[in-house]
């Protein structure tokens, strides 16, 4: 589909509501205004007008807002019609607009896409719009707004600027060896490179926090039947989300709860008790349990403390530990401390965390909550943060790898050409976050800021 088309879409959620909004963007937005409203409203003023059908009959009446480009969200001419929120009324108005030549229904996200293509937003800001809408906590909403206002992009652009400056010196030393420029060996390049690496590490740490706010942590509660898995789910959720009985195998399918711990989203999954089951339904539930375990960020290995004194997961159930994916973090949860009399709290056993609690009474559950938060490195005191997506983390990781490779080339062999290439690749990875990378970016900067002939 062409970006020269004029697009229209409903900007408010489907269904009944007090107000329904249609948004139009493109070259023919002016024609839509003149056809449906009979006039072109004064720019950026609210105008109360009837919305007319082709035969002149009034379909609805409401507020019309006219934003001529480029001073609009998309950078194009934009018309916004705010009428009553009945689905029939909005559908009639939408059908009327679509009869105007050159107007079509917008694709999902196309208004934001046009804003990006017209340099009204960079890619990270455009993504932040969706993140702000989908935010599931106050902290996530604030961080998404920070990203929309350019906080993340500013950090990335600062790194790109520093890399551009560094590349100027490196490439000058390579291309003009007779000009007595010896930046490769006098320590300046190394010092600047170390500074960029340190700044990148700081951005990566913030991005990991932002990713946690957006993606959350997937925690699977697993163990034998009657270990108290469903009771723990209820304790973490603060409500009776799962049925709890003394009958082994009560939970036969996956149960999911979405909760927050001091702003960090947590996807808690209760699974069927793991055992050799003859019942077909229970067997399917156990298969699903293993599927969830394999995709988890952390497994809470639930142990009935009344059945064993062991604390090492390898001693408690070696077959279970052997089947777990390699490097999957495990927290052993010894349950029923109210019966065994064990001291509540957390400790370390052979590289695994061990939490003693009572899911039935709730004692020790706060210790587990804090452990989950700390195990993911979540900082509840983070101010002015931003949201980040998995692709952002990947791009930052790639940039960090290129910088470390470049540093190795600099210190190991004084290989300026290889260093320059790693710096270029690092800059490209960073610029992919904002969508601003072009291969010609560096050329103009070199000739405008560095006097070679001096």
From Swiss-Prot:
One of its GO terms (biological process) is tRNA methylation. Gene3D superfamilies: P-loop containing nucleotide triphosphate hydrolases, Probable tRNA modification gtpase trme, domain 1, tRNA modification GTPase MnmE domain 2. It is found in: Cytoplasm. The gene is mnmE. GO terms for molecular function: GTP binding; GTPase activity; metal ion binding. Its EC number is 3.6.-.-. (6S)-5-formyl-5,6,7,8-tetrahydrofolate binds at residues 23, 80, 120, 454. Homodimer. Heterotetramer of two MnmE and two MnmG subunits. Exhibits a very high intrinsic GTPase hydrolysis rate. Involved in the addition of a carboxymethylaminomethyl (cmnm) group at the wobble position (U34) of certain tRNAs, forming tRNA-cmnm(5)s(2)U34. Transmembrane segments: none annotated. One of its GO terms (cellular component) is cytosol. PANTHER family: TRNA MODIFICATION GTPASE GTPBP3 (PTHR42714), TRNA MODIFICATION GTPASE GTPBP3, MITOCHONDRIAL (PTHR42714:SF2). HAMAP family: GTPase_MnmE (MF_00379). It is an enzyme of class 3 (hydrolase). Binds 1 potassium ion per subunit. InterPro entries: G_TrmE, GTP-bd, GTP-bd_TrmE_N, GTPase_MnmE, MnmE_dom2, MnmE_helical, P-loop_NTPase, Small_GTP-bd. This is tRNA modification GTPase MnmE. K(+) binds at residues 226, 245, 247, 250. GTP binds at residues 226-231, 245-251, 270-273, 335-338, 358-360.
């Amino acid at each position: 589909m062409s970006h020269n088309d004029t697009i229209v879409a409903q900007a408010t959620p489907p269904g009944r509501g007090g107000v329904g909004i249609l948004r139009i963007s493109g070259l023919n937005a002016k024609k839509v205004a003149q056809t449906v409203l009979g006039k072109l409203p004064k720019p950026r003023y609210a105008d109360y007008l009837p919305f007319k059908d082709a035969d002149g009959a009034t379909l609805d009446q409401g507020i019309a807002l006219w934003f001529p480009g480029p001073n609009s969200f998309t950078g194009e001419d934009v018309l916004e019609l705010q009428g009553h929120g009945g689905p029939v009324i909005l559908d009639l108005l939408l059908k009327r607009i679509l009869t105007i030549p050159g107007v079509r229904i917008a694709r999902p996200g196309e208004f934001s896409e046009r804003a990006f293509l017209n340099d009204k937003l960079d890619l990270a800001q455009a993504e932040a719009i969706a993140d702000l809408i989908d935010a599931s906590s106050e902290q996530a909403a604030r961080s998404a707004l920070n990203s929309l206002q350019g906080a993340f992009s500013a950090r990335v652009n600062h790194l790109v600027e520093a890399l551009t400056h560094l590349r100027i010196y490196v490439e000058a030393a390579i291309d003009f060896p007779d000009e007595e420029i010896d930046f490769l060996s006098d320590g300046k390049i190394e010092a600047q490179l170390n500074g960029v690496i340190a700044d990148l590490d700081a951005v990566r740490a913030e991005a990991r926090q932002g990713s946690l706010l957006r993606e959350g942590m997937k925690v699977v509660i697993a163990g034998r039947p009657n270990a108290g898995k469903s009771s723990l789910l209820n304790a973490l959720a603060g409500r009776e989300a799962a049925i709890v009985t003394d009958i082994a195998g009560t939970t036969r399918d996956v149960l999911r709860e979405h909760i927050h711990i001091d702003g960090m989203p947590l996807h808690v999954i209760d699974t069927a008790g793991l055992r050799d089951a003859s019942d077909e339904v229970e067997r399917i539930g156990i298969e699903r349990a293993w599927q969830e375990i394999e995709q988890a960020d952390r497994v809470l290995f639930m142990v009935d403390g009344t059945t064993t004194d062991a604390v090492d997961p390898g001693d408690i159930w070696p077959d279970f530990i052997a089947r777990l994916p390699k490097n999957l973090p495990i927290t052993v949860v010894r349950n029923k401390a109210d019966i065994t009399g064990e001291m509540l709290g957390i400790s370390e056993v052979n590289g695994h965390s061990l939490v003693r609690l009572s899911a039935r009474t709730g004692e020790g559950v706060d210790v587990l909550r804090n452990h989950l938060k700390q195990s993911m490195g979540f900082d509840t005191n983070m101010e002015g943060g931003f949201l980040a997506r998995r692709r952002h983390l990947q791009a930052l990781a790639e940039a960090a790898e290129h910088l470390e490779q470049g540093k190795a080339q600099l210190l190991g062999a004084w290989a300026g050409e290889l260093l320059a290439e790693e710096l270029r690749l690092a800059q490209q990875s960073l610029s992919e976050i904002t969508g601003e990378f072009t291969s010609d970016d560096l050329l103009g900067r070199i000739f405008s800021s560095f006097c070679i002939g001096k």
